[in-house]
Amino acid sequence: MRETGIKPIVIEEICDIARKYNVQKVILFGSRARGDFKTKSDIDLAVQGGDFIRFMLDVNEETSTLLKFDIFNLDEEIQNELREAIKKEGKLVYKANVSF
């Protein structure tokens, strides 16, 4: 995930937290997925399955980065434009039983 500007340890931590809360899928999208991010760009994640609230809290509190996270629940209703952006530019970070 080097082209995203996210340190490998942060990706590992996100995957560990996803496993902990039975998340099925984590998708990176936005500027970090497209590769046009700035140094302080936030990390946009879309999450499917599992305990979304606990996942979101732990990612914000327990990852080794000072970057801000915007985390969206794919199991809830979200704007069509946002859902399309996730489909178009999203990069799979974690899938249950398969991590990257």
Where are these regions (language model features)?
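Catalytic core of pol beta-like nucleotidyltransferases
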Residues: 1-25, 33-39, 48-100
